[in-house]
Amino acid sequence: MSYLPNGAIVLPAGEGRPIPGDGLLIPNLVGKVTADQGSGSIAAMEGTAEPGFGPPIHIHHSSEELFYVLQGQMDFQIGDQRVSATPGTLVMVPRGTAHAPRVVGRERARFLVMFAPAGPDGLFYEIAALAQENGGAINDNDSRIEALTAKYDTEHVGPPLQ
């Protein structure tokens, strides 16, 4: 990673801070720009997830979340609407809106996910650390998950999409 004098960040392909997925709440992610880099105004991660993966319906109360599908197909529940996204599709979820993605079809999905302002990206790192403490898996009924989501002004409000 290169930090330029004007605050710009240049991150070559294949670089970033890995976040191992737990198969339940988070996909495999690589942090490209995190809350502790730059001004904290944006966080960006590259993700991959297998068909069927999708977190519970949730709300980020303090950040917008943006998804850009690079490969595969994903469905999104955004409020009371369900949309399908294929490569090249951008989905922007306003702060305070209940939403959830789900990988559909037979192909692994690859996507970018961004938060503005940065902040909720820290939740992924902390859940990954918790999963690692538990041998790589996590129970979505674990009370620590609720505490972590609250710490990052995020709230689970429904089950994963089917």
Question: PLM features: residue spans?
Answer:
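Hydrophobic small-molecule pocket/channel-lining residues, especially in calycin-type beta-barrels
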Residues: D36, F53, H61, Q73-M74, ...
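A contiguous, mid-protein "functional segment" used to position or interact
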Residues: E107-A150
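Glycine- and acidic-residue-biased ligand/ion/polar-headgroup-sensing regions
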Residues: S62-M74, G79
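Conserved short histidine dyad/triad with adjacent acidic residue
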Residues: V30-G31, M45-H60
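A short, N-terminal "cap"/entry segment at the start of jelly-roll beta-barrel domains
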Residues: M1-I42, G135-Q162
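Ligand-binding loop in jelly-roll beta-barrel domains
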Residues: G38, D75, R95-D121
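Short acidic-glycine-tyrosine-enriched beta hairpin
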Residues: P12, Q73, D80-A98
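Residue-level recognition of specific faces of alpha-helices
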Residues: S41, E65-Y68, L123-E126
